[in-house]
Amino acid sequence: MIKKYLFLFFIFLIFNFVLSIQPPLSEYNCLKNFVTKFKLSTKFPTNSTGGYDFCSIVSCNPVNGSINGFLSLQSESTTPTTVTVVGTDLSCLPFNNLNLQNFLISTTLLYTKFFTSCSTLAINSDSITSITQVLAPYETFTIVSKKLNGALKMSNFINQKSILITNSNSTSGYTLVNDALAENKIKLETPNFSGLLSVPDLTGYTSLGYPAFYFSDALEVTSLALANIKTIGAVSSRLYFPSTKTIQFPTSYHNDTSYLTIQGKFTKPTAVIDLSKFVNCRNIQILNYDKTFNINGEIPIKTSPFTDIYYTDGNITKIPIGGTSFVTWSTEQSITIKKSGLSGTLPPLSGVIPTYYDFSGNSISGTLSNTWCNTNIIVTDNLMTGTLPSCIVCHLNNSEVAKKFTGNKFTNLVTSNPPCTTFAPKIKVDKSQKTIILTGTDFGTYTSGWILNTTLSCEKLWTKVTYGSNYTCTYPSTTTLDKVSYFWINFNTPGRNYTFPAISQVPTPNSIIVGTSNSVTISGTFFSTYIGYVTQSISVGSISCTVGTSSFSSITCTLDSAPSTNTEQKLIITTNSLIKEAYISTVVGFNNNKLCPNDCTSSTRGICYMNNGTCKCNSGYVGLDCSGLQCKVPNCSNGGTCNTTVGLCVCDSSHQSLDCSLDFKQCPKGLNSLICSGGGNSCNNQTGICTCNSSHQGLNCSINYKQCPIGSNSLICSGGGNSCNNQTGICKCDSSHQGSDCANDFIQCPLKNSIPCSGHGICNNKTGDCTCDSGFTNQDCSGYTCTSNNCNGHGVCDTSKGICQCYPEWQDIDCQTPFKNCLDPTCSNNGICKNTTGICECNSSHQGLTCSIDFNQCPIGSNSLICSGGSGNICNNQTGICTCDSSHQGPDCGTDFIKCPTQNLTPCNGFGNCNNITGSCSCDQNHQSEDCNIVYKECPIINSLICNGFDNSCNNQTGVCTCDDLHQGLDCGLEYKPCINNCNGNGVCNNQTSICTCYEAYQGETCQFQINQCPNNCTTGGDCDTITGICNCYPLRINNDCSGYECLDPNCGDHGICNDMNGLCICDKGYRGDNCIYVDHYASSVIPTKEEGGTVLIYGLFGEINNDPNVQVGNSNCLISNITSNSIECIIGKGSGIKDISVTQNGFEWIGKSMFNYIKSKQSCPNNCNSNGICNDLQGKCECYPGFTGHDCNSLSKTDLISPSTPKVNENTANGIIENGENKFEIMVITLQEKTFTNGVLKQYNLENNWKLLEIINDENNNIFKFKQNLTDSSEISINLEIIKKDRIINFADYSFEISKDSIKVSINISNYIYSNSLNYLQLHLKSNAYKTNKTSSDDEFDCNLDDGSDAKIDNQDLENSNINHENFVTIIKDNKILNGRYIDHVISDGISTFISSRTIEKDSNSITVGLNLPHCKNCLIDPDFSVLLSTDFKENCSDSNSNNYIIPVSITVSIGGAAVLVGSAIFFYRKKFIENTLKIQLKRLSKNNSSGSDGGNTQS
């Protein structure tokens, strides 16, 4: 209760604090004058003191009350006024967004930019009737007027990125003229035109993002110019035609259009509208005014398979699942059909179909089957009933899921702890692809709610493979799973946290307890992620244990019966094919948690006794962990030992065998010094004798041996005179034998020309006989054979040729066929004579013995008979014509012949044609009846029906219609309808239409309602419901008079607010884009590469959405290899010098000026070390010779004659001061500026004299002064000045330097600075002074070093020309004493070292101001250092003009840190990261001045 009251108390304080704020006096008076001039007393009432509490009404800066944000002013006059708003009325206010409503506006306000700080101007005034000049350069300009008419030139909008022109009068409008020059068409991005009379031609406008076009009711359809739509090349085109005009649906669009919204009253198409060629279109929205735009109840368009469809307020009767009658949809599309009359039940899904459907606001009934589980289905506000499938119920605790099914009558739509029994995700890890694969059932689709543990993380969001059933995520390449065995995933819906294995691993229990009631509890790992994830079985001894619960790390089960407790029992856990065995004690309550060494190596080698932690090794294995192999012979004799690594006896050199019981004798060595010559030869180590293989011989098997073939007589080479060569293994036969074994006799066949069998046969040397080849004969195969068997006895074979010579009465090659001649051997040239029969074979068109007679076939009837058969039908084969009998007709005599009715011997009475096939008359158009003797008169025809059909009748003899009770007229074409209630006496009834024509002031079907007017007649954005007086706004139009425009995303991505004047989102700081979904990205630090090229790292804010990312360094593309929300890694080629860097994504570009500096391989030294040292070109530092010092070795190191410096801190100004003699050097942090990309100063914070001392810390080493001041209500800047009491080394970005005693170290912290734009940057100004004190020098011997009052000498050359080793030097010399300033060219930006540039802001005779260009960072750490030294012109003895010069070592090191403080957090997180080659901002010695004499007084810079 106390906390509650405290909270209310603080709210009260905050409220009163807000009310107490007032604008600065000049702004107060400016707004007061405006309120007074225009009498705005209602919105701005006076308070009790007679003044105004402006900041309680308009937006004021909560710190200083300045009206520097959004200002909206509205006239309170209800009648026309002559008081005009002019530019000077409000130019005294610093707002950045102005909205003027219903004032009389001066035209100069439109064309002159009076409000310099303003970027957005909106005017709603009917005093604007035309736009005749170029509008003032406000980036966003809105003009709303009911009297804005005529032709508007696009050249008048060349200064705008966003333009909104609205004529809210539905009876008039304007057109657009494309007259701008090409170079002036680039800037316009978001045009919004309302009240158009035709589609504008936007040829040449290439930067359009999301234009919108609203057309007036006054447009003429004939001059609408729909063809111009294809000139609108934009990411998204929106066209809204009025509901009062019917137009053809446009069919031609620009190829670059990705998103299309079109609203109108479209004519009913007669054919499908093919938009499939517009393959770049990703989404098309069709917003209907009536129900006609369909074909047979289907969406009448055909799109590409990549175009999403959004259709609303139409008439679609068929629920489309996989497509329509015109097109098959793809899985890449989403389908939305809202408020369009869909009815019936949702059919089950099958096949390849889209995975997104939105059927909200229809009349779909029935249940939702589980076939819809793997789709994104939305059925809000339908008539569905029954139970939702478990795949949906599991995720109803997610409000985004639940709202998809509200507005129905589902019985299980429970959003709090919904029952879930089917949730079963499965995980697979592919280490080669560094990918986690998620499959399973009913795990949902809300990937952002799948959270991995810290072991793993997805580089990006989960990637869909198959919607609802297969997703993958890739973990970073730097992550290794070699040592990761498992990990967990937290599924926010349905609220389950599961641990999954990353490897295949047997169950690993580490604790097993048998409890009461035969329960068993097992703890460990690699069991089952949940019951059913793997197949599990558990047994203890021979008793099964039924699993009750299971997770990755525990199992509970119940034994079927009590186990024995006398001895340890074997526990067996099986998961899929993996088995784990262990022996346990089954004593109730005993914890078997003793793990064995190395888990007994493996399940095949041993089993662990988990009651005492010892292994029971399986047969063949030995050792504490069963890792050793038992020898096959337990005792190795003759001094042998058992090697348990391999399980074999190791014998000494004179013994062998498994148990070392046999002696060992070596056999002789042969070829290649191998025992028994190696190869397949073997040695008998017991006898020492070689046993050669079949191919070798000899004592050491070194001689080859090949056996010859053995003959049938079992003799080698068959014995006799045959011989064998054992070296080659080949037999050599004598002259009377042959064959590989010489076993066959050899007999020569007959020869011809010394060739056996004449070369035409095969000789059988065993018999001496020839076997002739086919076609040859005789004993020596020298003759030829005939093809027949001795010419069949009808001829003689000529063996010299192999041809039959037939006798005269025979023919053919074998003389087998008799020869007969025809009567006419030529067959009249119409056939062929067959000599085998002597008969002519005629062709198809002739006949007869000699083929001399023509032949024509008669037609064949349907009964397959010539001339249809019958006795009376005759065929003439010479003419091919049938002659029919009297009862048949037709060419094939297949048709009956029937006579028609005849009168006066004239068929059909002479008024018709007789059909002898049917015997019926076809009367002419003027006669009727069977014999055509009655006259025929036609009745009137309407709708292609005689007398309009229905129950109307026609008298064809008179030609007169007789109408039924519901029709009238000569053709019965007019309905007869009475009006309901006779129009209630408030109108006139048309009985033909049954429609009432109401009197003025009445409406309704029966004139039963009076007319109520709507506000502003619904502007042009809706239809008036004159019954209720309420506007029904068109889609994307809002407010009670439909005057407002709804943004594409009304919530603006939850990162902005919708401006209903133009339908555009006003994004929160840090977001951009039409729907505010993109972060306003920027880079805060860059780690460059060497001049040879390589990997570049960019850190900053880039968000989760990175469409078409691109990085440019100067003019070179840096190829992106990886991108996250806060870093980019890219690869660039070689280059050199300082470059701009740009990061482009999501269509927006960010540029960092001079932010990239290639790392040099070699560095030069300042002034080449003045020949007083050696240059270290790796670091760019001088290594001075003895006696010299300084960054360029131009100072002497002798310091014993110099008085010490005195460091101080001014507690009022926070200035660091070092005094030395009469000289005072002062270092101040004076200004912080927020600068634009074009280097303009947007904001400036004067830091000088505004510091507040917080604390002084003094100890033996240091003395620290802490100051701070507020920059805005949410950011501050603090400064610490530390007086160094002992020498010490400071490291900054891998750069080391020494801070000497009596130095001052300055640290600056800029906390939580909020930039006005992501392209802006901060510039910090540091000022250094040198001047005289009023002290009298006690070192008179050095008076010759005092100047004569002349100015100090300042050199800032290196600062302006930074080319040396990351260090810039500025020096101030006074009385030969030097304030030496070194500025490093790197800062630590948000924890990362990055390059910065610096420049001289101002320089006069005794001071210099340096500006450090900080990156767009939240935390910046800058580290310049300052030193007071002696010039080489300093004289040790004034009498000796040639004496050596000395240096006073007094150093001031300044560290400026921007460690941003997170608002509302008690934790300060600071992170430093250093890289090679830091920027050093150094002070350089200027030219020497040898003037002497007494000090003429102080010179203040």
UniProtKB/Swiss-Prot annotation:
Residues 1468-1501 are cytoplasmic. It is a single-pass type I membrane protein. Residues 21-1446 are extracellular. It is found in: Membrane. Its main location: membrane. Residues 1-20 form the signal peptide. Induction: Down-regulated by Pseudomonas aeruginosa, PAO1 strain and up-regulated by PA14 strain infection. Residues 627-661, 782-816, 818-852, 896-933, 975-1008, 1043-1077, 1161-1194 form the EGF-like domain. Glycans are attached at residues 47, 64, 169, 192, 255, 315, 397, 453, 470, 497, 612, 635, 643, 685, 693, 700, 726, 765, 835, 843, 877, 916, 956, 991, 1017, 1122, 1270, 1309, 1334, 1437. PROSITE patterns: EGF_1 (PS00022), EGF_2 (PS01186), EGF_3 (PS50026). Regulates aggregation via a pathway that involves lagC and tgrD1/lagD. Inhibits lagC and activates lagD expression. This is EGF-like domain-containing protein comC. It comes from Dictyostelium discoideum. The lineage of its organism: Eukaryota, Amoebozoa, Evosea, Eumycetozoa, Dictyostelia. The gene is comC.
